[in-house]
């Protein structure tokens, strides 16, 4: 059996491939993306619903069965250095598989992916001058 290593398609793997090929034109790097994140917030939809109910003067955040479903949806809010926000989410279909840490990782990655086009647009505008 052939052991063929497939190329990495994650952000760091792609950046390494760019460097290996000697490409040096201006670009956004994974480090640029991370450096642009000023703050990170995580919460579940259940926590959001409970806070919204509390602020509305109610102690009910929906039916108990909804609480289980809402607890499986994790949000990540990234505040960028300029104050702009991007969000990511992670939904778990099965309560038995829910893991808060994994949910936060997936939600953050999904939010981080939204920064690329924003910073790419900004770079292109600067290059166009």
Feature map (PLM): residue ranges:
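Domain-level marker for long, solvent-exposed, non-transmembrane regions
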Residues: 1-129
């Amino acid at each position: 059996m052939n052991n063929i290593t497939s190329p990495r398609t994650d952000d760091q793997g792609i950046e390494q491939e760019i460097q290996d090929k000697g490409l040096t034109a201006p670009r956004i790097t994974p480090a640029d993306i991370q450096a642009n994140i000023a703050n990170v917030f995580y919460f579940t939809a259940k926590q959001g619903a409970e806070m919204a109910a509390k602020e509305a003067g109610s102690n009910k955040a929906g039916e108990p069965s909804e609480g289980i479903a809402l607890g499986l949806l994790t949000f990540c809010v990234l505040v960028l250095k300029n104050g702009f926000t991007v969000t990511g989410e992670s939904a778990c279909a099965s309560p038995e598989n829910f893991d808060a840490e994994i949910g936060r990782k997936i939600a953050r990655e999904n939010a981080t992916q939204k920064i690329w086009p924003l910073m790419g647009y900004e770079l292109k505008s600067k290059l166009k001058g």
